């Protein structure tokens, strides 16, 4: 079983899968009589149909025990999905490129710094939220509308991957 190498999350490395939502290194302009920096358009919400809505939810996720066997990935073909951490804890992101099914050899893992969010582009394969330190809350921006917007792919036992933060140290 292949152990995923966990990479630091950067805009450049994550670009094939979506957007990194962070203020560090991002352009801004001043608003509210000069008292507020606006980091404008850090990500774009994608929806498939004009009648779809962009919605905001909060996910409260329990810590997952590591190492974790990656048995499945999911994708949202009708809209993007963004996760912004609310409590400042680092979390893991596991993704695979667009395609009919995720290719195990192309799966990548990233570690956020706790202040970075991610916006998965439409159709990008990803693992459900991976909280690693303690229970965590995420502001989630995604799509509401008709149609099935969640495809799941389960790997065969031979294709499964191991996510082990200790292996990177």
UniProtKB/Swiss-Prot annotation:
Cofactor: Ni(2+)
Keyword Lyase set for record: yes
Pfam families on file: Ureidogly_lyase
TM region positions: none
Pathway: Nitrogen metabolism; (S)-allantoin degradation
Gene3D superfamilies in alphabetical order: Ureidoglycolate hydrolase
Single Gene Ontology BP annotation: allantoin catabolic process
Role this protein plays: Catalyzes the catabolism of the allantoin degradation intermediate (S)-ureidoglycolate, generating urea and glyoxylate. Involved in the utilization of allantoin as nitrogen source.
HAMAP family named among the record's database cross-references: Ureidogly_lyase
Full protein name: Ureidoglycolate lyase
Organism: Pseudomonas paraeruginosa (strain DSM 24068 / PA7) (Pseudomonas aeruginosa (strain PA7))
Taxonomic placement: Bacteria, Pseudomonadati, Pseudomonadota, Gammaproteobacteria, Pseudomonadales
Protein encoded by which gene: allA
